[in-house]
């Protein structure tokens, strides 16, 4: 079985870890992927409040939804912190990785993409000038065509898959 995966935002970090752990995964694309889970957690009183309530909410800046974050996620991370250290997995990953990042991402700064690129031995970095965290997409998407930045990211992903995945297996 040969698998190619794509991960966005926190899912970019998760998919990088999974690509490191799972030999079936042959190639990875991260879109606005995070480089570190630990520094995204609150500390001090905010951490204690989260623990006591079991959930905290953060507002999605695009949709204004209140997004739940359950304390169990933090506990799981702490119990498995070594496993969930993106930097370690990235530095030991021997698979092709495409890192796509927008320069106007309000949630994941482009510095994280540069770190991922530095850590991943077999990576390509693709920066999209002016692209935000969702590459111009929003929910609900009512248009016929993808936004230009997302279409650009999709085209680059297809190019990368053709070069690093499809030609090897078909």
Briefly describe each language-model feature range:
Residues 104-108, 133:
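Acidic catalytic loop of the alpha/beta-hydrolase fold
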Residues 92-94, 99-101, 105:
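Short beta-strand/loop motif that positions the catalytic acidic residue
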Residues 43-61:
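A catalytic-pocket lid/entrance helix-loop region that shapes and gates access to the active site
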Residues 28, 125-127:
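Conserved beta-strand scaffold positions in the cores of enzyme catalytic domains, especially
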Residues 1-47:
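Primarily recognizes the serine-hydrolase "nucleophile elbow" in alpha/beta-hydrolase
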Residues 131, 135, 139-170:
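Catalytic active-site module of serine/aspartate enzymes centered on a nucleophile-bearing elbow/loop
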Residues 95, 108-118:
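Short alpha-helix in the alpha/beta-hydrolase fold that links the catalytic acid
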Residues 70-89:
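Active-site nucleophile elbow and catalytic-triad environment of alpha/beta-hydrolase enzymes
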